[in-house]
Amino acid sequence: ASHTGKTVLAQKLLEKHKYPYLSIDHLKMGLIRSGYTKLTVKDDDKLTEYLWPIVREMIKTAIENRQNLIVEGCYIPFDWVNDFEKEYLDNIKYYCLVMSKKYIENNFDNIKKYANAVESRIDDEWCTMESVLDENTKFLKGAKKHNVNIVFIDDSYKVDIDL
């Protein structure tokens, strides 16, 4: 979900492990700004369909080349596992960051405050408590339905992933 700290976490993992990361948002904006797609930043579901085949093959290439790569972003389908054979899956760790309703309601000001911790968000007006609640509810349902690893942010923001 948006505003959960994915990019900050990827940056911390880069600094700790020296693994490069791919921000799917950067790929998205490059394709939109270059005119290679008519999709806009508001076309979330369509962007997932459009971006995922590219990202998926980048992941496969990194694994084939025995290279570490952190991929972060919202545009990964919950059924991503179906697109990889076992030899790839053995080399992939997936985590879905989701904030609880309680956390969002108690910390919304901080969520907005830290939105620019690693990236500059030019237009963040769409980010309301309601939109963050809705998006995190959607992501939690999707993650549970597909039985993926969830990093559930509930009482405090403590996200630490061991690679």
What are these regions (language model features)?
Residues 7:
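Walker A/P-loop
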Residues 92-138:
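A glycine- and Lys/Arg-enriched "phosphate-lid" helix/loop adjacent to the NTP-binding pocket
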Residues 46-99:
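Glycine-rich phosphate-binding loop used to anchor ATP phosphates in small-molecule kinases
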Residues 137-163:
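NTP-dependent small-molecule kinase module
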Residues 3-4:
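ATP-binding Walker
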Residues 19-21, 91-96, 150-152:
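Conserved beta-strand scaffold positions in the cores of enzyme catalytic domains, especially
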Residues 26-29, 76-77, 99-105, 157-158:
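Conserved nucleotide-binding/hydrolysis micro-motifs of P-loop NTPases
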Residues 11-54:
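Conserved substrate/cofactor phosphate-moiety recognition/catalytic segment
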